[in-house]
From Swiss-Prot:
Origin superkingdom: Bacteria
Classification lineage: Bacteria, Pseudomonadati, Pseudomonadota, Gammaproteobacteria, Moraxellales
Residues where Zn(2+) binds: H173, H175, D186
Disulfide bond positions: none
Any GO MF annotation of the entry: metallopeptidase activity
Family of the protein in this entry: Belongs to the UPF0758 family.
Keywords: Hydrolase, Metal-binding, Metalloprotease, Protease, Zinc
Name of the protein described by the UniProt record: UPF0758 protein Pcryo_2119
CDD domains in the cross-refs: MPN_DUF2466
Annotated MPN domain residues: 102-224
Pfam families: RadC (PF04002), UPF0758_N (PF20582)
PROSITE patterns: MPN (PS50249)
Chain positions of motif JAMM motif: 173-186
């Protein structure tokens, strides 16, 4: 049965407008962006199949272009719609952080960093430069490593922060193929960078790790040196 023949309260778009986004499944949200299915599948059936194939909506959004385009029912137009939805979310979060509206909420910071780093095939290290009011001045990936490690130069991080006149920093990196649990090397880098920042009156306020399926904040979890 085509979606247009469903009861109004079950159609994704009508359900979204009537009950709100929280009442929609990942497949229903994705179906709204896909708009149409295939000859044998409705948009929701196609969305469910894609999510099952990749394991989650997050995994689908992080997958390489060629992998998604190889899926039955996904052509350049549908893939462009998926990318546009992801970019719209990124830009919304970016605008929130640049006006200081989101940095008082750790979830907003984690969401922003997650959208920036999830999908990177290699480990990368990024820095968010902030002013005294927690407005985002600059976000930049400073270092790119291999599949499971990334070398970081603390002096370069400090020079980068000073060049943007930052008074506060959040650092972030990803674990592209594992969970977000900090490694011993992660903890040591955080401690050394915090100590270096303190020497020049620069506040390191968090270290965020984006894992394969979750995001961890040192500050939110009171991990050293933020305990």
């Amino acid at each position: 049965m085509a979606i247009k023949d469903w009861h109004e309260d079950d159609r994704p778009r009508e359900k979204l407008l009537k009950f709100g986004a929280a009442h929609l499944s990942d497949a229903e949200i994705l179906a709204i962006f896909l708009r149409t299915g295939t000859q044998s599948q409705s948009a929701i059936e196609l969305a469910r199949h894609l999510i099952e194939q990749f394991g989650s909506l997050a995994e689908l959004l992080a997958a390489p272009q060629e992998t998604v385009l190889a899926c039955h029912g996904i052509g350049p137009a549908k893939y462009a719609q998926i990318l546009a939805s992801l970019e719209m979310g990124r830009r919304y979060l970016d605008s929130q952080l640049k006006t200081g509206q989101g940095l008082g909420r750790s979830q907003m910071v984690k969401d922003y960093i997650s959208t920036q780093l999830r999908g990177e095939p290699r480990e990368v290290f990024a820095v968010l430069c902030l002013d005294n009011a927690l407005n985002l001045i600059n976000f930049e990936i400073l270092f790119t490593g291999g599949i499971s490690s990334c070398s970081v130069c603390i002096k370069h991080v400090l020079r980068h922060a000073l060049s943007h006149a930052a008074s506060q920093l959040i650092i972030a990196h990803n674990h592209p193929h594992t969970d977000a649990k900090p490694s011993t090397a992660d903890n040591l880098l955080t401690y050394e960078l915090k100590k270096a920042c303190d020497l020049i009156d620069l506040s390191l306020i968090d270290h965020v790790i984006v894992g394969r399926n979750e995001t961890l904040s040192y500050a939110e979890n009171s991990l050293p040196p933020f305990n």
